[in-house]
UniProtKB/Swiss-Prot annotation:
Residues 523-703, 717-897 form the CBM11 domain. One of its GO terms (cellular component) is extracellular region. This is Mannan endo-1,4-beta-mannosidase. It comes from the Bacteria. The carbohydrate-binding modules (CBMs) are responsible for the affinity to carob galactomannan.
């Protein structure tokens, strides 16, 4: 009886949260807090019963409960016979956690996605989630989203984070990505209609600098606000209640939580505290040193999770780089790696819920990727022993038993400024201020109390709009405030009807902005350290690598000129081997008009290895100034001549793919990052010390590099064979070489067009969509001066097409198509430069559909062949390709099968078809049109927001409300409470009809 009454009261309370805002609950059953065993501190208090049960199960993990997971557990594999993945083939079991990347799958770049139809891809991904659940596996989704501002890939680090927030230039574009996530989650159901809980891990490894949401591309404040926006949008606007949200920076933190928490969005938006770390050092025979590092950091993460009532997980791990599993399957060190890691976590961090490794994508050469053992590999037996060591490691019915659902703990009401973002610049005299409330019912808010105050005495009146937002406009002109490079601090104040002021979501709730555009800095001024007001600003620009932010500080310049300098503190005890800091440049900078790099250096005499690193044209170059003295002096590092000859820079020793390359002016025209490292030189040298640097500048002016888009005749380029297939002994060898996209099951060797020659056969039935691709990694091949890509194709007369894509090292893809309206062998020659039939298909930026230029030929990453279903009545294609080569202009016929523009299927994200206005503002809608989520969150079982655990004498989940739950009691008290509910709601009841926001993918 008590349970039923509590549920109905909760329903009444939820129903009283009326009009104009979405799910902002602030209460739990009988006021239970996160510390109470009967409730969980979950980010979504309206989460489905199954989602709360999963949270509880994972949070309460103890010794023996560790689960093993893998990305693409069943749909990528190394062994050709592993139809259900290598893990299943070697162990007879599925991993307990399955992972996919929603960002890639939904745009068709990874399985189960195929093609550009996000609607179809959402259905396919949801079906895979359902299948994983039926196998006894928990599902986690990451999101390698394209850069919404440029349309380029996730590693395009053009800063965009603040423009994705409400009112931002690309908020509408980003919302489409979130809509697809919502569509996937809401379709992921069991056969009885139960929504399957999913762990969603957006914006991962943000403390690195390789993603657009990463360090130096998004400030800590921007990152936190963007993460919160993702959760708010999915949970409150899209009404998705079967997601747990994971936060997962990458290591190493040396057990210190400072940097780990620097971008933590807050407990109201996070459920899983994760950690990503890979072992890439192959010098040791065992993995103990790396495991000790992981354990030290995981203890820190576990402590933080315990304090907050959250889940702890090793969200990504594996062996990569030099330590990766070898393509041959032999010669790997420490094949007991998985058992050793699992045992260390179980013993030292028993609360770890799961550890997930990456996908067995395969491929060949340097691009080979395997993260588990496979059939026939040296580690097969040890991996099977690992899988058999504990039943909880692998999938099972119990693993996905979500019958025991605790209540959601009460959340404290809060208010925060969403825009402008703390630390950002304001360049418009009319500033739109958006304040978001969380954890409080609309009916409890004092709408007339909402204001934002400034530290100059202004009060900005806020008006409630929808989705929990208040908005107002600060008119700087009217306030007499100039855009003069000064600062302005804003503080929100929102009260409830009982006079209480909502707490700040972060710190004291204030945000400080800079007034006016950032002063332009000339390209030759690489770094003078004088533009930073404080160390936090400096540390937001430079990303630590195997160090901590606090080891980069501002000091007085050793040049004694009254200016600032930068000080790098190294600590090889805490961070062994190397410490460093990197600054990325987006867009890339053109340094080609200068011949040297100067800097003022005051070293500590340690004689360690000082590394000055420049990434130019996608290649990492290094120079090594001596630091064996202590006197301050100017260091001058030469770039060499136009071709890089005679310079001080050489490719990094670990970048074997570019060994011997010179730092030419052409490469210097595209500088993507600049970094400073101190490497441990061993011996009796000190384990800690400091370097002070200032006045890092480009010098030695010269004519800048000018691309030659029209090469002169008679260039010295020679024909290059891309692949004649003669070197492959069997199908497996050919599949390995052409495995850069997976999908190798469609490939086999065939007889070539001439006696004794070989070809690559591509036979495919369109079962995974019209576009299905294979690729060979070309490792930055230089095609400069080449005129034609030539190859032979055997047609099948199907009327379909073979699509060819040339991928460059800077992320561009150029597409041409060969229509298979013929049979037998045919010579195809595709002009490479200024060819209207070979045009940029990706990214979908301003250069889309433009032809290749000579400049694009300098570094070729991969060659792609793909099926294109041009004939809808056919059931597949069967074609072969032979003798692929590039040739200079002479002796080429310059003929190409015409491209059928009407049928070309480009593997690109068609959701990027943007109108002129790509912005959106979920805060600016009419309250009457906002989604109203004030009724019970229905989930799969009609659960309310405030359920309690089942009592020991019943097997029914305690959250089965609705008709069945109410009818079982037969008590008159239910009628009485229902009557009270009607009185409480009064005339407002008519307003509780839910209105859903349009734009869902159905």
């Amino acid at each position: 009886m008590k349970t039923t009454v509590t549920k109905l009261l909760a329903t009444v309370a939820a129903a009283s949260t009326i009009f104009g805002m979405s799910t902002l609950p602030a209460f739990a059953a009988e006021g239970k807090s996160a510390s109470n065993g009967n409730s969980v501190n979950i980010s979504d208090v309206n989460a489905t019963a199954e989602t709360r049960a999963l949270f509880d199960k994972l949070k309460n993990s103890g010794k023996g409960d560790l689960r093993f997971g893998q990305q693409h557990a069943t749909d990528e594999n190394i062994s050709s016979s592993a139809s259900q993945g290598d893990v299943y083939e070697t162990t007879g079991k599925y991993p307990a956690v399955f992972g996919w990347d929603a960002g890639l799958a939904l745009r068709g770049a990874e399985k189960p996605g195929s093609g550009a139809d996000k609607n179809a891809n959402a259905k396919a991904l949801a079906q895979n989630i359902t299948d994983a659940d039926s196998k006894g596996a928990i599902v986690t989704l990451s999101a390698h989203w394209c850069n919404p501002g440029t349309g380029k890939d996730f590693n395009d680090t053009t800063a965009v984070a603040s423009e994705l927030l409400p009112g931002g230039k690309y908020s509408g574009t980003f919302n489409k990505e979130l809509d697809a996530i919502a569509a996937t989650a809401q379709r992921a159901k069991r056969s009885d209609g139960t929504l399957i809980p999913i762990i969603f891990r957006p914006l991962h490894e943000n403390n690195g600098s390789w993603f657009w949401w990463g360090a130096t591309h998004a400030s800590a404040s921007e990152y936190k606000e963007l993460y919160r926006y993702i959760v708010d949008y999915l949970r409150d606007v899209k009404d998705v209640h079967n997601l747990l949200y994971a936060y997962s920076p990458g290591g190493v933190f040396n057990g210190d939580s400072t940097d780990y928490l620097a971008t933590y969005p807050g407990d109201q938006w996070v459920d899983v505290l994760g950690y990503d770390e890979y072992d890439s050092d192959d010098s040791a025979d065992d993995s103990s040193a790396w495991i000790n590092t992981v354990v030290k950091d995981m203890k820190m993460v576990s402590d933080q999770a315990s304090q907050r009532g959250k889940i702890v997980a090793l969200t990504e791990f594996g062996r990569s780089g030099d330590r990766k599993f070898k393509e041959s399957g032999t010669g790997d060190k420490d094949t007991k790696f998985f058992s050793e890691l699992a045992e260390a976590l179980a013993e030292n961090v028993p609360s770890t819920a799961y550890m997930m490794t990456w996908a067995n994508f395969g491929g060949g050469g340097d691009n080979f990727q395997a993260y588990t053992s496979w059939k026939g590999s040296d580690g097969e037996a040890d991996f099977k022993a690992f899988a058999d060591s504990n039943k909880n490691l692998m999938a099972s019915k119990d693993n996905v038993d979500y019958s025991n659902a605790p209540a959601a703990a009460m959340q404290n009401g809060s208010a925060r400024i969403v825009t402008p973002v703390d630390g950002n610049r304001v360049t418009d005299t009319k500033v739109v201020v958006r304040v978001k409330t969380e954890g409080v019912k609309y009916s409890d808010l004092d709408l007339n109390s909402a204001i934002v105050t400034t530290d100059r005495g202004q009060n900005v009146k806020l008006k409630y709009s929808c989705n929990g937002y208040f908005t107002g406009i600060l008119d700087l002109n009217a306030a007499g405030i100039n855009l003069d490079q000064s600062k302005l601090t804003l503080t929100p104040q929102v009260k409830t009807k009982d006079g209480k002021t909502l707490a700040a979501a972060d710190g004291n709730g204030s945000v400080t902005v800079k007034l006016g555009a950032k002063p332009e800095q000339t390209v030759d001024n690489v770094e003078d350290f004088d533009s930073y007001d404080n160390e936090a600003e400096l540390q937001s620009v430079y990303s630590p690598s195997h160090s901590t932010k606090s080891n980069l500080t501002l000091v007085d310049s050793p040049e004694d000129n009254g200016t600032k300098a930068g000080n790098i503190h190294y600590d090889f005890v805490s961070y062994p081997e190397y410490n460093g800091f990197q600054r990325s440049h987006t867009p890339k900078q053109d340094w080609s008009g200068f011949s040297k790099l100067n800097m003022f250096l005051k070293a500590d005499g340690s004689d360690h290895k000082f590394v000055v690193q420049v990434n130019a044209g996608g290649v990492t170059f290094e120079a090594y100034p001596k630091i064996d003295g202590t006197d301050g002096h100017v260091v001058s590092l030469n770039f060499g001549d136009a071709d890089g000859n005679g310079g001080d820079f050489a490719p990094a020793s670990w970048d074997t793919a570019h060994a011997g390359m010179k730092l030419s002016q052409k490469l210097l025209s595209k500088v993507g990052s600049f970094a400073l490292y101190i490497n441990d030189n061993g011996g009796n040298r000190p384990k800690s010390g400091d370097l002070t640097l200032d006045s890092i500048k480009l010098d030695g002016k010269r004519d800048a590099y000018a691309p030659n888009t029209n090469p002169t005749p008679g260039n010295t380029a020679k024909a290059q064979s891309v692949d004649d297939f003669s070197g492959y002994s069997d199908d497996a060898a050919a599949q390995s070489a052409w495995g850069n996209r997976g999908h190798t099951e469609v490939l086999s060797l065939d007889e070539g067009p001439t006696d004794g020659s070989k070809a690559l056969r591509f036979k495919y039935d369109f079962s995974n969509g019209g576009w299905y691709d294979v690729a060979k990694y070309l490792d930055g091949a230089n095609w400069s001066g080449e005129s034609v890509l030539a190859f032979q194709v055997k047609g099948d007369g199907s009327g379909n097409a073979i699509g060819l894509q040339i991928g460059t090292s800077d992320g561009k893809y150029f597409l041409a198509s060969v229509k298979l309206d013929f049979t037998g062998w045919k010579q195809i020659e595709i002009p490479l430069v200024d060819n209207a039939n070979l045009t940029q298909s990706w990214p979908e930026d301003a250069n889309k559909d433009n032809p290749m230029t000579e400049d694009d030929l300098a570094s070729i990453k991969e060659l792609v062949f793909a099926s294109q279903q041009w004939n809808s009545e056919s059931d597949g294609l069967d074609s072969s390709i032979a003798d692929i080569k590039v040739e200079p202009a002479e002796n080429t016929s310059n003929e190409q099968t015409p491209k059928d523009e009407s049928k070309t299927e480009v593997k690109a994200d068609k959701e990027q078809e943007q109108s002129e206005d790509t912005s959106a503002d979920v805060t600016a809608q009419d309250p009457a049109t906002c989604p109203i989520s004030d009724e019970d969150s229905k989930g799969s079982t009609g659960n309310t927001t405030v359920t309690v655990k089942p009592t020991p004498d019943t097997k029914e989940p305690a959250d089965n409300t609705g008709k069945d739950g109410l009818s079982r009691t037969g008590s008159n008290i239910i009628s009485a409470i229902a009557a009270v509910a009607v009185l409480l709601l009064g005339g407002c009841a008519v307003l509780i009809a839910r209105k859903r926001k349009g734009g869902d993918i159905e």
